Amino acid sequence: MVLRYTALGDSLTTGRGSGLFSPGFVQRFGDMMEADLKTRTAINIFARSGLNTEEILGLLSYPYVQKCIRDADMITITGCGNDLIDSVLAYQTSKDETIFSRVSAHCHENFEKMIAKVAEIKGENPSPYAIRVFNLYNPFPEIDIAGKWITSFNSHLETLASAPHVKIADAYSIFKGKEQEYLSFDGVHPNSKGYQAMAEAVHKLGYKELSVS
C-alpha cells in the first residue's frame, strides 16, 4: 500500500531557507509517516514562494491538483505568512492597526474555503483522510502589534479544527523564544532545525483519521 500525501502552500511548503541539500518539513514528515505506518509515502507538492492565501486557494481549481487531493490520505497546508509580511510592511508605513484585522479575517476565510473545497473534491463517502493546517509563528518578535495579531489569528484558526479531518499544527509555540535557533539567515523562513521542528509538530498530531493508522 502507498500513503498519498499532498502538501499545499507557500515558501514553508517548498522548504525555502532549509539549505541546498536539506529537506523542508514535507519530506521530513513523509519520512516519519513511512517509519510509523510501515508503508511507502508518495508526496505531491503544490506550493510556491510568495503565494498568499487567495493564491493557495486558487491552486485547488487546477485539475491535476484536484486529482491529487482526491487521492490524498494526508493533506498539509501552510499559508498567511506572506499576507502577514505584507500587512507588517503596510502597518510600518500607515500605522493603521485595522490592517491586521482585515488581513486576519481574509486569511481565515480563505482557509475555510480551502477546507470546504477539499471536502467538495473528495465528494460523498470519501476514503479516510486528514488535513493538517499550520498556524503562524512570529518572525517579528520586536514588533509588538505583529505579536498580538498573530496570537489573535492563531486563536481564531483553532476554530477550523471543529471540521472533520482537520487539526492545527502548532508552529507558533515551537518557534517562540527560539527564533534565532530556528530561523534562517533571512530572519523569516525556517532553517533546517526549524523545518525539523515543524515536521515534529505535525507528526505529533497522529493519523487516527486514516485507515492505515
UniProtKB/Swiss-Prot annotation:
Signal peptide: none annotated. Keywords: Hydrolase, Sporulation. It is found in: Spore coat. Gene3D superfamilies: SGNH hydrolase (3.40.50.1110). This is Spore germination lipase LipC. It is an enzyme of class 3 (hydrolase). The active site is at residues 11, 186, 189. It comes from the Bacteria. Its EC number is 3.-.-.-. The lineage of its organism: Bacteria, Bacillati, Bacillota, Bacilli, Bacillales. Substrate binds at residues 50, 82. Belongs to the 'GDSL' lipolytic enzyme family. GO terms for molecular function: lysophospholipase activity. Induction: Transcribed under the control of SigK and positively regulated by GerE. It holds the Pfam family Lipase_GDSL. Lipase involved in spore germination. It comes from Bacillus subtilis (strain 168). SUPFAM superfamilies: SGNH hydrolase. GO terms for biological process: lipid catabolic process; sporulation resulting in formation of a cellular spore.
